[in-house]
C-alpha cells in the first residue's frame, strides 16, 4: 500500500543561526532559524500546566458510587451523547473489558464519523474550570480505533488517536492539558484486507485517572565546570585545523637593506586573545627582531613551535604574522616552552589554521619565559567511532535528481571612445576589447538512477561518536588589550553555510511541539538540538502525536511530519521510528494537492524491519522521502557528532569501513549529514532484528513529496 504525502518546510530561530537544505547533495536553500523557532510557544499538555483537581478526582473515577441507568451529571461534570452506567458481571462468552475485571462501567454507542461523540465536560458546580486526564481504561464492542477530541479554553481542539481492544486498553494522554471538555469519537477506520467495520460501536469506560498537581519539573542535569575566574561555554564542532612547524637553526637570516644592532632586545608576543578566526597579516610590520617566514602552506593541525629562539636581526615577508599580535582561532594550544637564544631560524612552514591557540601572556626580554596563562576555547575530542557490520539482502538504490544545462552567447566588443558622462573611459588610452557573455536558455531534465547492492555484501556503518568536552577558563576583564595588527584583513579559512533571512516554510506546529517536549526532557539545550532528541524513540513518537494533536488540517499535519523527519533524517539508522512512527497518522489523514517548494534537495530512505510471529516471518519495508535539513548548533549546547557517512560513486557498493580514523578534511560549521551523499547506502545496527536503511542522493527539484510504502512478504519457517 502506498500513501502519497505532501512535503513543505517551515520555521524560524535564535542568534541568526542557519539550517541548510541539501548538504547531502552539496547544495540547497539556507533558512534562518531565529527567535520564531527557538522561542515558539509551547502547547498545554498534562505535564506543563497546573492541574487543579477535586477530592473525587484525586482518587480517580471507577463509577462504584454511580447508580445504574442514564448518566447526565457526576461530581459536577456534564456527561453527554448517551452515557449510561451499568454493572459488568462478566457474562459467559463476553470478553469486552475483561482486562479490568468486574465492576461498574459507563457505556454509550457512537455512530461512525459523529463529531459530537460521547462527551465529558466541566459543569458549573465542578469547582474547577479545566482538567487534564491522565488515562482512560476503555473497551470497545470490537477492536477499533478511537479518537479523543479535547475542547481547549482558546477554542482550539487537541486530538488524540488510539487503538482500543475489545478486551480493554489503557489509553494515556500526553498531549492535551487544561481542557474544558473531552469527546470520545468513533472515526472512519483504517481499512484492512478482509475486515469490515460496523457503522456503530459500543464504547465502555471502566476508569478515569486524572493528572493533578503542579507541572512536571524538567529533569535536572549536572554540568562539570572547572574552577576559573570566568567560565564561558561556547559551541564547537570537531573541525580540521592547519599545522605550523617551526625548527631552530644555527644561523641568522639578515635582510640586505635592513639591519639592526646585535644588542637589541628580543621582542616576543606581548598579548594574545582568543577569537573565532585566524587572521594572518598580509603586510609585514617589521619589529626590532622578528623571525622571517619563508613559505606558507596549509597543513592539517595548528600547533605552536615546541622551542623558539629569538634572533637579533629583522626581515620582512609578504605573508607573516606581526610579532606584536596574534589573533587565534576557536581552539588554542599554548606554547610548551620558549627559550632565549642568539640565533634565529625562519619558520619553514607557517600557516594560520582554523583553530589556533596562542599563549595568553609572554614576558618580553632577552630571556622569554614559558606562557603563564592560556585560555583555550572549548575543546571537543571525538572518541573513536564504533562500527557495526550487517549483511543484508539485495538492496535497490533509487536516486532522482535534475540535470541543468544552460546555453550562453558570447560576443566581443571594442571600445574606442565614450560619451562625456563617462569619467573613466576604458578607451581613453586606445581601443579596449571586452567580452560579453549572456545566458540564452536553461534546460532542466529529471534523471532517475537505479542500482542494486549485491546480496550478502557486508556493509559497515560508523555509529555516532561521543565527544568529551572540557570547559576552560576565559581571560578576566583586567587583561590588557593587545595592539591590533596593521594591514588588510584577509578572508578567513573557515567555510560556513550562508546566512539567510528567509524563514523556513514549515507549519508553526513543528517548533511549538519541539519546545513542548524539549522542556520536559533533560540534557537537550533547545529545540534545535537534534543530536539530543532525534535518537530518542519516545520523544520522536511524542512529536508525531503532538503534530497530529495540534495540526490545523491534514495538509499541515503532512507537511509538519515531513519537515520533522527531515530534521532527524540522519538519525534513522539508530532510530527507525523517525521513518516508521508516523505511519498510522499518515494512513488516517487525507492530503489534497501536492505542495511544492523549489530548490530543495531530498533523499529517499528505505527501512526494512523483520517481525517473527508464531511460525512465520514478516518483513515490512517502509520508504520515506524526506528533505535534507541540517539544524544549527543549539544555543549554549555542546553538539554531538552525528553518524558518519560514506560517499561512493554511482553504481558501486558502499566500501567497507576499516575502523581507522580517516584523514581530516575541511568541514563546514554545521555537522555533516549522516545519510549518505551521492548514491551510497547506510545500514543501521540491529535493534530488534534486521533494519537496513538505504538512502538515495539528495536532488534539487521543483517539487517535494513524501511517499510511505509498506510492502510485506510472509515466509514459513
Curated annotation (Swiss-Prot):
Residues 696-717 form a propeptide. It comes from the Eukaryota. Keywords: Cell membrane, Cell wall, Disulfide bond, Glycoprotein, GPI-anchor, Lipoprotein, Membrane, Repeat, Secreted, Signal. It is found in: Secreted, Cell wall; Cell membrane. Residues 1-19 form the signal peptide. Disulfide bonds join 513-546, 524-532, 534-568. Residues 275-366 have a biased composition (Polar residues). Cell surface adhesion protein that plays a key role in virulence by allowing adherence to the insect host surface. Required to orientate the cytoskeleton and stimulate the expression of genes involved in the cell cycle. Is also involved in achieving the septin hourglass shape and subsequent separation of cells. The CFEM domain is involved in heme-binding. It contains 8 cysteines and is found in proteins from several pathogenic fungi, including both human and plant pathogens. Belongs to the RBT5 family. This is Adhesion cell surface protein MAD1. It comes from Metarhizium anisopliae.
Amino acid at each position: 500500500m502506498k500513501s502519497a504525502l505532501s512535503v513543505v518546510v517551515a520555521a524560524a530561530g535564535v542568534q541568526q543561526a542557519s539550517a541548510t537544505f541539501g548538504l547531502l547533495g552539496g547544495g540547497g536553500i539556507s533558512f534562518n532559524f531565529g527567535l520564531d523557532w527557538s522561542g515558539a510557544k509551547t502547547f498545554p499538555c498534562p505535564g506543563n500546566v497546573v492541574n487543579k483537581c477535586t477530592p473525587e478526582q484525586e482518587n480517580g473515577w471507577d463509577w462504584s458510587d454511580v447508580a445504574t441507568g442514564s448518566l447526565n451529571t457526576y461530581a459536577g461534570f456534564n456527561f453527554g451523547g448517551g452515557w449510561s452506567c451499568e454493572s459488568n458481571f462478566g457474562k459467559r462468552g463476553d470478553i469486552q473489558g475483561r482486562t479490568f475485571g468486574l465492576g461498574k462501567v459507563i457505556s454509550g454507542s457512537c455512530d461512525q464519523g459523529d463529531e459530537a461523540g460521547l462527551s465529558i465536560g466541566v459543569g458549573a458546580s465542578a469547582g474547577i474550570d479545566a482538567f487534564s486526564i491522565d488515562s482512560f481504561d476503555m473497551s470497545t464492542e470490537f477492536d477499533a480505533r478511537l479518537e479523543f477530541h479535547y475542547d481547549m479554553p482558546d477554542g482550539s481542539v487537541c486530538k488524540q488517536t488510539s487503538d482500543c481492544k475489545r478486551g480493554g486498553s489503557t489509553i494515556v494522554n500526553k498531549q492535551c492539558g487544561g481542557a474544558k471538555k473531552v469527546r470520545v469519537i468513533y472515526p472512519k477506520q483504517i481499512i484492512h484486507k478482509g475486515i469490515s467495520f460496523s457503522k456503530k460501536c459500543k464504547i465502555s469506560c471502566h476508569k478515569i485517572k486524572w493528572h493533578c498537581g503542579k507541572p512536571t519539573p524538567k529533569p535536572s542535569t549536572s554540568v562539570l565546570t572547572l574552577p576559573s575566574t570566568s567560565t564561558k561555554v561556547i559551541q564547537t564542532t570537531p573541525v580540521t585545523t592547519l599545522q605550523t612547524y617551526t625548527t631552530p637553526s644555527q644561523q641568522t637570516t639578515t635582510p640586505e637593506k635592513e639591519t639592526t644592532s646585535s644588542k637589541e632586545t628580543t621582542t616576543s608576543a606581548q598579548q594574545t586573545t582568543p577569537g573565532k578566526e585566524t587572521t594572518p597579516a598580509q603586510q609585514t610590520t617589521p619589529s626590532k627582531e622578528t623571525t622571517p617566514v619563508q613559505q606558507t602552506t596549509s597543513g592539517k593541525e595548528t600547533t605552536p613551535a615546541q622551542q623558539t629562539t629569538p634572533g637579533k636581526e629583522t626581515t620582512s615577508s609578504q605573508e607573516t604574522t606581526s610579532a606584536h599580535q596574534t589573533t587565534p582561532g576557536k581552539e588554542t594550544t599554548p606554547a610548551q616552552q620558549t627559550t632565549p637564544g642568539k640565533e634565529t631560524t625562519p619558520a619553514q612552514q607557517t600557516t594560520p589554521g582554523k583553530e589556533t591557540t596562542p599563549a595568553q601572556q609572554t614576558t618580553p626580554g632577552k630571556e622569554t619565559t614559558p606562557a603563564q596563562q592560556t585560555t583555550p576555547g572549548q575543546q571537543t575530542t571525538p572518541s573513536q567511532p564504533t562500527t557495526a557490520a550487517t549483511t543484508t539482502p539485495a538492496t535497490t538504490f533509487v536516486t532522482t535528481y535534475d540535470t541543468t544545462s544552460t546555453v550562453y552567447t558570447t560576443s566581443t566588443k571594442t571600445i574606442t571612445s565614450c560619451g562625456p558622462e563617462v569619467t573613466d573611459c576604458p578607451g581613453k588610452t586606445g581601443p579596449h576589447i571586452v567580452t560579453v557573455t549572456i545566458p540564452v536558455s536553461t534546460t532542466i531534465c529529471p534523471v532517475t538512477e537505479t542500482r542494486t547492492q549485491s546480496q550478502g555484501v557486508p556493509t559497515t556503518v560508523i555509529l555516532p561518536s561521543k565527544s568529551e568536552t572540557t570547559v576552560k577558563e576565559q581571560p578576566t576583564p583586567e587583561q590588557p588589550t593587545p595592539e591590533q595588527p596593521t594591514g588588510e584583513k584577509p578572508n578567513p579559512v573557515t567555510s560556513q553555510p550562508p546566512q539567510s533571512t528567509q524563514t523556513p516554510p514549515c507549519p508553526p506546529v513543528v517548533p511549538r511541539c519541539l519546545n513542548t517536549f524539549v522542556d520536559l526532557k533533560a540534557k537537550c539545550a533547545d529545540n534545535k538540538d537534534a543530536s539530543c532528541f532525534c535518537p530518542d524513540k519516545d520523544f520522536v513518537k511524542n512529536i508525531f502525536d503532538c503534530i497530529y494533536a495540534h495540526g490545523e488540517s491534514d495538509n499541515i499535519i503532512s507537511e509538519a511530519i515531513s519537515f520533522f523527519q527531515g530534521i532527524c533524517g540522519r538519525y534513522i539508522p539508530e532510530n527507525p521510528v523517525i521513518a516508521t512512527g508516523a505511519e498510522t497518522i499518515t494512513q488516517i489523514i487525507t492530503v489534497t494537492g501536492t505542495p511544492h517548494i523549489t530548490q530543495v534537495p531530498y533523499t529517499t530512505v528505505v527501512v526494512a524491519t523483520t517481525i517473527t510471529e508464531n511460525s512465520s516471518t514478516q518483513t515490512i519495508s517502509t520508504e520515506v522521502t524526506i528533505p535534507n535539513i541540517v539544524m544549527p548548533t543549539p544555543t549554549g549546547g555542546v553538539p554531538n557528532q552525528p553518524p558518519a557517512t560514506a560517499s561512493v560513486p554511482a553504481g558501486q557498493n558502499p566500501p567497507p569501513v576499516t575502523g581507522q580514523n580517516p584523514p581530516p578534511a575541511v568541514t563546514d560549521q554545521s555537522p555533516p549529514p549522516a545519510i549518505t551523499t551521492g548514491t551510497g547506502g547506510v545500514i543501521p545496527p540491529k535493534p530488534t532484528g534486521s533494519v537496513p536503511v538505504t538512502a538515495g542522493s539528495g536532488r534539487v527539484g521543483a517539487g517535494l513529496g513524501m511517499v510511505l510504502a509498506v510492502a510485506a512478504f510472509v515466509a514459513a519457517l
